[in-house]
Amino acid sequence: MGHELTKNDIKKMEEEIEYRIHEVRKAALDDVKETRAQGDLSENFEYHAAKRFKNKNESRIRYLQRTIKNATVIDDSSADDEVGVNNTVEVLYEDDESTETIKIVTTIRADSLSGMISIESPLGKALLGHKKGDRVLVQVNPQVEYYVVIKSISNTDDSDAVSYTHLRAHETELHL
């Protein structure tokens, strides 16, 4: 089974595929041709770096295509009063009385250091469908579990997400 993705996640991945096929691929091939013409390939670092970059780009295209092909499309809308995808949630950790504001996102957008928690993570799974004030059991594994209380829920969207094209654009600039 593949990732659970929203329609917008897939749209952004398709944008990156198009960008990589029509922009990056052409530039990478030109770079390989140009560095190949510099002579002895056995000692031509630029040629080998250009080939590696071209192969990395092709690998990324295949990865994105495979991810989309195997994805399960999920709805990113939820009721105003319950936790769903793209909601910002403030939780209270009962064990130490600390609070944290997190955003529930699809796995492909998850970044726990930035407070973007995957719907497939123990915390994300536990919170989905719950309401403000609910005390929720989070099971990390059979030996580790803890409780959180939902303090607030904000219905947001994924407009804070950076386009996949822009996330990868710096790769191209570094190698061309």
What are these regions (language model features)?
Residues 161-163:
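Acidic, proline/serine/threonine- and glycine-rich low-complexity intrinsically disordered segments
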Residues 48-77, 81:
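Internal alpha/beta loop-helix hairpins
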Residues 20, 31, 38, 64-71, ...:
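Conserved, well-folded catalytic cores of nucleic-acid-processing
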Residues 165-172:
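Conserved small/polar residues in nucleotide/adenosyl-binding loops
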